From Swiss-Prot:
Protein's name in the database: Visual system homeobox 2
InterPro entries named among the record's database cross-references: CVC, HD, Homeobox_CS, Homeodomain-like_sf, OAR_dom, VSX_homeobox_regulators
Gene this protein is translated from: vsx2
Biased composition (Basic and acidic residues): 319-341, 365-393
SUPFAM superfamilies: Homeodomain-like (SSF46689)
Subcellular location(s) per record: Nucleus
Start and end residues of each CVC domain: 225-299
Function recorded in the entry: Acts as a transcriptional regulator. Mediates the differentiation of V2a interneurons. Plays a role in eye development and organization of the neuroretina.
Length: 393
């Protein structure tokens, strides 16, 4: 602030000094008034209460009121104390002398003075400083808006870069779905070759086919869970396979039965139901691997029947000792503990026999090895003797 504003403030400060001198009772000693104004009371400690002046004792010298100073003086003094430049702002500009700043601004209890300053009217200073502050606030607001717009633009650009482009959902044709369903009925986990063949048939990328199979497997598992929690049976058992492919269940005594199903035993009426469903035209709903399971079961049943027939044709005559032991076991009822002890003894005897056999085989192998080594040594010694005789002759 320079020019007329500075002259007005200096005149107001001079008037305030003259008023202070008259209030002091016409004291001709100016040093006492300056010392009473400029020297603030010393702070006793560095605590929060001491800094804020909460525990401060009332000073002996009367504190000068705000009414004795003009509006511009205490405003500049408060700005110089609270601003980042400190006290030197007002002093360096020449508006306020080094002794012109009153003592209550430098005291720790400046909060009370600032609260009292709300009742003071600052009309003459607001008229002169108002346009400048308005321009400064407008410029600062515009700078803030521009900086915020720049930050928003940068953040939007970074977010647009980070966001991945969303892929459009593929729409399968009926032909593609038919081919995929056929492949899924043949194998739930197709290999690379099968996926390549499907890609050539359906003209779809291989990654899309892989994703379709993943989704189809998830859908199939969900269905199996809803159908009586038969996911395990649907994977390995016959009951789940029949439920999955809508094959009629076998009927006994007028009611469908499921007690005869297991992983390795296939009832005869299961084959009949499969063949009936195939003849009636439900072949499309029946998976080909189901018929493969039926064929394998028939083959295994044929092998087992052949083995049983061979065993019956060449019966082995049991030894008389074993027959007598069996008769004794059947005649004499034994408790569970006796049976357990006998079984443990039999196991121990078998273990001893096995260990003896192993030791016998090991000992025989050692003897054979020793015999071979002695034979090779004898042959080598004979060859050496023959060579020495030839040399001597």
């Amino acid at each position: 602030m320079t020019g007329k504003d500075g002259a007005v403030l200096s005149e107001s400060l001079n008037k305030s000094k003259s008023l202070c001198a008259t209030e002091n009772g016409g004291n001709n000693n100016p040093h006492l008034s300056k010392s009473s104004i400029t020297h603030p009371p010393k702070c006793t400690g560095f605590g929060i209460q001491e800094i804020l002046g909460l525990n401060k004792e009332p000073s002996s010298a009367p504190r000068s009121t705000l009414d004795s100073f003009p509006a511009g003086a205490h405003l500049l003094a408060s700005r110089s104390m609270l601003g980042p430049a400190g006290v030197g702002v007002g002093v360096g500009m020449g508006l306020i002398g080094p002794g012109g700043i009153p003592s209550f601004y430098s005291q720790p209890a400046f909060l009370e003075v600032l609260s009292d300053a709300q009742n003071v009217h600052l009309q003459p200073l607001s008229r002169t400083v108002g346009p400048l502050e308005h321009n400064q606030s407008a410029s600062s607001d515009s700078d803030d808006v521009s900086s915020s717009e720049r930050k928003m633009s940068k953040s939007s650009l970074s977010q647009s870069k980070k966001r991945k482009k969303r892929r459009h959902r593929t729409i399968f044709t009926s032909y593609q779905l038919e081919e995929l369903e056929k492949a899924f009925n043949e194998a739930h986990y197709p290999d690379v070759y099968a996926r390549e063949m499907l890609a050539m048939k359906t003209e779809l990328p291989e990654d899309r086919i892989q994703v379709w199979f993943q989704n189809r497997r998830a859908k199939w598992r969900k269905r199996e869970k809803c159908w009586g929690r038969s996911s395990v049976m649907a994977e390995y058992g016959l009951y789940g396979a029949m439920v999955r492919h809508s094959i009629p269940l076998p009927v006994q005594d007028g009611f469908p039965t499921t007690s005869c199903f297991s992983k390795h035993e296939y009832p005869p009426f299961f084959a009949e139901s499969i063949l009936k469903s195939a003849k009636d035209g439900i072949m499309d709903s029946c998976a080909p691997w189901l018929l493969g399971m039926h064929k394998k079961s028939l083959e295994t049943a044929g092998h087992q029947s052949n083995e049983k027939s061979d065993v019956t044709q060449t019966p082995t005559n049991p030894k008389p000792d074993e027959a007598e032991a069996e008769e004794r076991r059947t005649e004499s009822p034994m408790s569970k503990e006796e049976l357990r002890e006998n079984s443990i003894a039999a196991l121990r005897a078998k273990a001893q026999e096995h260990s003896a056999k192993v030791l016998g085989t090991v000992s025989s192998e050692r003897l054979e090895h020793n015999m071979e080594t002695t034979a090779t040594e004898e042959k080598s010694s004979e060859q050496i003797d023959a060579k020495e005789e030839e040399k001597s002759s």
